[in-house]
Amino acid sequence: MGGMISSAGAAGVINNNSETTNMKENADSLNFEDRTYETRTMKVDGKNVTFRAYENIPYVANPVDTTYQSMNVYIPEAYFHNEKDHKYTAESAPIFLPNSVGGYRPGKAATPTLFKDGEPNAVLYALSRGLVVAAPAARGRSNETIEGVYYGKAPAAIVDLKAAVAYLHKNDKNMPGDANKIISNGTSAGGALSLLLGATGDEPDYAPYLQEIGAANARTDIFAISTYCPITDLIDVDWLAYNTSVGRMKAPGAFDARDNFTGENNLFGTATIDNQHFTKFASFNGDGTAVADEHIIKMMNPLNYIKPNGSTEHWRIRYGEIDNNTSMAVTLIVATRLANYGYDVNFDLPWGIPHAGDYDLEELFDWIDKIVNE
């Protein structure tokens, strides 16, 4: 694989003014091998990290919005010279798949970054450890055309992430990295999507949505997931009491508010309705407006898909001890179900940690090295 030193661009279907055009791309647009790239070098812990940056790659043939249906791929330079990078080669390197979704809003494709304190973000740190990085963007609940049509409501975000995975499987022979070793990562709503990506594998519920956007005809299962403070299992946090040692943040009906005005109500809207309830309790005891389609509600909850003999073997779940955005019981329930079905679960409630993610990158990538090399 080769290319000129340039930034890979993509013509938007929806531009900065969210104007919609009709775009059809043929299946050849999903081939990675002819993509252009830019060679970059950044420092991590005083050492040079050199990699090739392939950016703004559409991962579907019929995108609704190329800004949010594209991804950035970063590959250590060593793999183009038949050299090892840390423990890995071009054939064995796992693929780190971080999403940047927060609050179920649209998430742009992540880039390698150094914070003000000089510490690397997860993308750059992954490269420093020899991983290939595929960072997909994804649509979210606030995407809207100038005509007032919403195009990022549930299940758009998880469909987009699954399409990105399908792209990687399709191009497994065309690019460095092992698509059989994809590790997803996300925080908060992005953490919930990471869980969902692992739980759903090749579930047929998503097939019509993938076909509609022109996803590659390939597998959508992944090897492992990492999740921080996942905002998940939204319908089951309607208890009357909350963890008093942490303090209550949300009233009962934590995510499906009776006034139909939370971000999660916004998530379950439609193309023409901005907000909808997703529990009968909130609708009946609140404003009486409609409840979202049951099948779509199902598609956004990993507990509906976690079952024995799934394709994702390894699960790393973190929920901070002073995080009151949801109950730590939610992640405990998810971890317990996974463990009961025999999956490899690495679960922790780190002391003194609030609603946050990527705070233990060295531990995270030590875990990745361990599960990949077992």
Where are these regions (language model features)?
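Catalytic-loop region of hydrolases
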Residues: 13-87
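Sec-dependent signal peptide cleavage junction
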Residues: 2-18
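Alpha/beta-hydrolase active-site loop
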Residues: 150-174, 360
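Cap/lid segment of the alpha/beta-hydrolase catalytic domain
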Residues: 99-158, 198-200
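Primarily recognizes the serine-hydrolase "nucleophile elbow" in alpha/beta-hydrolase
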Residues: 170-247, 297
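Long, low-complexity, polar/charged, intrinsically disordered or flexibly structured peripheral segments
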Residues: 259-303
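Short beta-strand element of the alpha/beta-hydrolase
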Residues: 71, 86-104
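C-terminal catalytic histidine-bearing segment of alpha/beta-hydrolase fold enzymes
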Residues: 239-240, 314-323, 328-374
